[in-house]
Amino acid sequence: LELKNIYKTFNPGTINEKRALNGLNLKLNEGDFVTVIGGNGAGKSTMLNAVAGTWPVDEGQILIDNIDVTKLSEHKRATYLGRVFQDPMTGTAATMGIEENLALAKRRGKSRLLRSGITKAEREEYKELLKILGLGLEDRLTSKVGLLSGGQRQALTLLMATLQKPKLLLLDEPAAGMNPQETEE
């Protein structure tokens, strides 16, 4: 990931104008693990949203694997990214089952072909992956995600974000919805 001279201002030209990113430069190499620390309103989430394409930047350039993604839409950038949001309600489809959410995550960035739903092999794979979490979700594959606790949902979101082995994993307070025991696990 490389961020070159990134600027982002909210509500420009108004009394509520707020410069969130001011000439941000950052270069990360494959395998780097970075934690961004700052107070409320420091621009941490804004930076992640800019990288993900949720909010376009005012100026600057965003490169992933030396590919300029600055003008790419959020859904096109998703090919490169895995993401866990601060809010455990974001990143999953509440009215769909656990296995359906996992299937969507597994197919992220792939061509959508007409085919049957979730295969038996996929279901078994999902059970094994969920078992690792130790939350009992492997026995609730058809349960609606909206019925899960915040911590269960956040753990599921983390699993979904890593199913495709993304080039870049964006974590915005990934343990926010988890209780201390779930966070430790």
Describe every region a protein language model picked out:
Residues 14-18, 56, 68-82, 90, ...:
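ABC ATPase NBD coupling module
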Residues 37-39:
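The feature captures the beta-strand-to-loop junction immediately N-terminal to the Walker
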Residues 52:
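Helix-to-loop junction immediately C-terminal to a conserved catalytic motif
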Residues 60-68:
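Conserved ABC transporter NBD signature motif
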Residues 87, 95-111:
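Q-loop/switch helix immediately C-terminal to the Walker
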Residues 161-167:
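A short, proline-enriched helix->beta-strand linker immediately N-terminal to the Walker B motif
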Residues 169-173:
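Catalytic Walker B motif of ABC-type/P-loop ATPase nucleotide-binding domains
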